[in-house]
């Protein structure tokens, strides 16, 4: 396919226009008084959402050069969502402000490379400053506060707080759609681990990018599966049962993986394959834990169980399995509660007699996974549109709560970013030339999230930013009440991990856009047909 090429200022301007179209659409959702965006769908009714990454994912622009800018900023939102599960709108408005300020400096003659280096140094300094003022999260009340701020819903916050408090920091919180109108919390047996699907073709829920298997069989395999003749007899038996299949193995590759993908696409067999976590003896022990949870056996030639020869009696089961690109949750495994309890007691006995601190730590992790169980938040609503929106809110709240446990919390509402600007003043004195200008650009960009939170709440953003800049650390605007005060005490908090991810990802994309000198895109088909030049119209 032939290409269109733009250079220098023309390329950067087109990309900035595209970035602004996406960011201006997303930023209206920021803050407790943020607005909604209605997304038309090719099939079914429209989706109403105030989730930044959901909006960003839907945007593709007609002009290919503008679309480059939009897709770059979209990557900020998706990367922040992948790392922290929240903070996507904050990341987007930060990136927009950085690019806008940076391009102004470049137009005035600043060196883009030096400017970008200054922006990167500023991002690192702000990241360190945020960690320095973080408050550790402990207890149900603190987790509830974080979840409530993220979801803008006290009921959701309370459910997430209760669920995470019960299953512990190593426990799993799963979100499902309810068959009733109520949103409620259930505790069930289950286990989760940090490995996702081996192919995106296994995805069954395209909105959440997850593979969801209801009432599946579970195949646990100690070794790598690459040969189709080895796997095919089992696939045929599972297909006859009419049930979906989860495969957990050292790896699945070659024709075995290809066959599983083809069967999933054709819907002959609903299946998902994931790698088993860990290595060596730890992997072996974890698979044995999974076997007890699911009521199955680990297929291992060393113990006389060869995959091509075994029947479905070695398979475990579960009520539900949810697999994303990063993790797997097995809910309500088919193993007996007595067997799980016996395994937990056995592991605790091993902890007592172990001389190795490392071994004790790893054994305790296994106990936490087995004993913690799974908290399932079942989301209900009157309409399908309301259900999707509410489920997104719950998922964001769970992600924010997990992030807050990892790195602590800071004052929310954009105030912490404005007040972290003080850390940049000292850094600026150590830099010269265009690198120092990068610090100035970043200093101004830090005001953007608070500015838009205030603007969306009907206030004058510039006035609010000026006022908060002069308040004591941790104080700021509570956009829900439109008052000022101690935000942590008022429960207006953000997870540090979320804010740091937003800062670092926004800086990375801004630096890329500022140093772009040439943009190359495919020539749109309709432009080729009419032999037009330049952008598509």
Swiss-Prot record:
InterPro entries: Chaperonin_Cpn60_CS (IPR018370), Cpn60/GroEL (IPR001844), Cpn60/GroEL/TCP-1 (IPR002423), GroEL-like_apical_dom_sf (IPR027409), GROEL-like_equatorial_sf (IPR027413), TCP-1-like_intermed_sf (IPR027410). The keyword Methyltransferase does not apply. Keywords: ATP-binding, Chaperone, Cytoplasm, Isomerase, Nucleotide-binding. One of its GO terms (molecular function) is unfolded protein binding. One of its GO terms (cellular component) is cytoplasm. Its EC number is 5.6.1.7. It catalyses: ATP + H2O + a folded polypeptide = ADP + phosphate + an unfolded polypeptide. GO terms for biological process: protein refolding. It holds the Pfam family Cpn60_TCP1. It comes from the Bacteria. It is found in: Cytoplasm. ATP binds at residues 29-32, 86-90, 413, 494. The keyword Nucleotide-binding applies. CDD domains: GroEL. Forms a cylinder of 14 subunits composed of two heptameric rings stacked back-to-back. Interacts with the co-chaperonin GroES. Belongs to the chaperonin (HSP60) family. NCBIfam families: GroEL, PRK00013.1, PRK12849.1, PRK12850.1, PRK12851.1. Together with its co-chaperonin GroES, plays an essential role in assisting protein folding. The GroEL-GroES system forms a nano-cage that allows encapsulation of the non-native substrate proteins and provides a physical environment optimized to promote and accelerate protein folding. PANTHER family: 60 KDA HEAT SHOCK PROTEIN, MITOCHONDRIAL. This is Chaperonin GroEL 1. The gene is groEL1.
